[in-house]
Amino acid sequence: MAGMSLLRRVSVTAVAALSGRSLGTRLGFGGFLTRGFPKAVAPVRHSGGHGKRLFVIKPSRFYDIRFLKLLRFYIALTGIPVVIIITLVNVFIGEAELAEIPEGYIPEHWEYYKHPISRWIARNFYDSPEKIYEKSMAVLQIEAEKAELRLKELEVRRLMRMRGDGPWYYYETIDKELIDHSPKATPDN
């Protein structure tokens, strides 16, 4: 680029010198090819000192900053109300105290927890221990019935092999005399 610019200026100076005009001195040249570079018309200024400032290409931080701002916003959006609710529950309701159980009263499963928030979670989201026990007993009963059926099937297969019986889904073929082989006008006749 610099070479092309220098070549253009030299050619302009050469044309001016050959045409008899003194265009070369007005362009900053002393004469035809007397100097390699033109003089600076105005002083070059680099603002801020420390030489020429460079444009450094670096990745954008827009999405990083936006993500961090949204993260702080949503943490504040959910965290502040949760902190307020927990503080109000601790101040105004407080923890449960251990007391004697009245005669004939059966406590619910959530009443064994000390903190009110733990009680609320146990009451609304967790199953009672009795329900969990019944579900596990139902699973055990189903698995026991499956094991019993597998043993019965093995015993049936053993007896069938021993006695030479066919499978229980075996059907006798129909008698050939019942099949009508006469020509038919339509397939459904």
Swiss-Prot record:
Protein origin, superkingdom: Eukaryota
Membrane topology, record value: Single-pass membrane protein
Record-linked InterPro entries: NADH_UbQ_OxRdtase_B5_su
Organism name: Macaca fascicularis (Crab-eating macaque)
Transmembrane segments: 73-93
Family stated for the protein in its record: Belongs to the complex I NDUFB5 subunit family.
Intrachain S-S bonds: none
UniProt function note: Accessory subunit of the mitochondrial membrane respiratory chain NADH dehydrogenase (Complex I), that is believed not to be involved in catalysis. Complex I functions in the transfer of electrons from NADH to the respiratory chain. The immediate electron acceptor for the enzyme is believed to be ubiquinone.
Gene Ontology, cellular component aspect: mitochondrial inner membrane; nucleoplasm; respiratory chain complex I
Lineage, highest ranks first: Eukaryota, Metazoa, Chordata, Craniata, Vertebrata
Keyword tags: Electron transport, Membrane, Mitochondrion, Mitochondrion inner membrane, Respiratory chain, Transit peptide, Transmembrane, Transmembrane helix, Transport
Subunit note: Complex I is composed of 45 different subunits.
Range of the transit peptide: 1-46
Subcellular location(s) of the protein: Mitochondrion inner membrane
Name by which UniProt lists this protein: NADH dehydrogenase [ubiquinone] 1 beta subcomplex subunit 5, mitochondrial
Main subcellular localisation: mitochondrion
PANTHER family: NADH DEHYDROGENASE [UBIQUINONE] 1 BETA SUBCOMPLEX SUBUNIT 5, MITOCHONDRIAL, NADH-UBIQUINONE OXIDOREDUCTASE SGDH SUBUNIT
